Swiss-Prot record:
Organism lineage string: Bacteria, Pseudomonadati, Pseudomonadota, Gammaproteobacteria, Enterobacterales
Organism encoding this protein: Salmonella typhimurium (strain LT2 / SGSC1412 / ATCC 700720)
CC cofactor: pyridoxal 5'-phosphate
Protein name in UniProt: Cysteine synthase A
Keywords: Allosteric enzyme, Amino-acid biosynthesis, Cysteine biosynthesis, Pyridoxal phosphate, Transferase
Lineage top rank: taxon: Bacteria
Amino acid sequence: MSKIYEDNSLTIGHTPLVRLNRIGNGRILAKVESRNPSFSVKCRIGANMIWDAEKRGVLKPGVELVEPTSGNTGIALAYVAAARGYKLTLTMPETMSIERRKLLKALGANLVLTEGAKGMKGAIQKAEEIVASDPQKYLLLQQFSNPANPEIHEKTTGPEIWEDTDGQVDVFISGVGTGGTLTGVTRYIKGTKGKTDLITVAVEPTDSPVIAQALAGEEIKPGPHKIQGIGAGFIPGNLDLKLIDKVVGITNEEAISTARRLMEEEGILAGISSGAAVAAALKLQEDESFTNKNIVVILPSSGERYLSTALFADLFTEKELQQ
C-alpha cells in the first residue's frame, strides 16, 4: 500500500532510539531527533503550532506568522510555513550560529536579529512589538507558552519512547528550552501510561541555573552561556515544574566535549545541547542507584547546525578551512 504525505509538515516523528555503546554503560538510549524533516526536535512543535492555529481559525490566507527563536524552532516553522504557503518573520538573538541564519533565509523567512546580550527576552520583546504594530496582520505563535507545543510531544514523542522501550524506561532526560518536550513526554509516560516512578530530569546550563533557582525558591538570576537551544534565562510557561524530579547543570565545556564524543565514538552527529543531555546522563550513572536503569535522552539536533561555533572551533587548521 502506498504512503504519500500531502506536504512535508506531515512527516514529523518516528525518530530512532539508539543505544550508546561506548558512552556510558550501555543503558543510555538516545532519541535522535535530527532525523525529523528539518533536522531537529523542533519540527514537531513547528508543525503542530501551525496546524493548531489553522484548526482554531486564527491562521488563514493573508495572516503572517511571527515568532522569537534561538534557531531550531525558527527553522522548523520556516519549513512548515513554506510547505503550507505562509509568510513568516522570525526574531533571533544575534549570537546564534550563522548556519541557522542561512537556513532561515533559504527557507524564505524574514529574519530580524536582536541584541545578543538581551538573550531570548530581547527576541520575544521584538516579536511582540512587530505583532502590536498590526494585530490583524500578524500572528504570534508563542512557543514558550503555546499548549500545542507540549501537546505534540504528549501525542508523538512520548508514545514513541514508550513503544520503542516496551514501557521499560526508567529515566527521561531533556534539556529545557521551551519546556515542551519535558512536559509533554512526562505527561504521557507518568500520566497516560501510569508509570509514576519515571524519573524526569531537566538539563540546564550551570551558567544560567534558573530552574534550580525556581525550585529552590530563590531569585531567578540568568546568565550568558554557549549551549544554544536550552537555558532561555526564565521559566517558560510550557515547563511544568511539578513534573521535574531532578535538575542537572552542565557547563559549556561538558556539553561541547560530550557532543564531540557522540560524533567520534558513537557516529551520531550531535549538537551542543545534545552533548549537554548526554553529559547529564553520565553524571547520573556516577550514582550506583542509576546503574541498572534505562535512561532515555533527547538529542535535539545535528552537529551540522553548529559548524561555526565552539563545537568545531579547534578541529581544523586555517589551511584546512580554505576552499
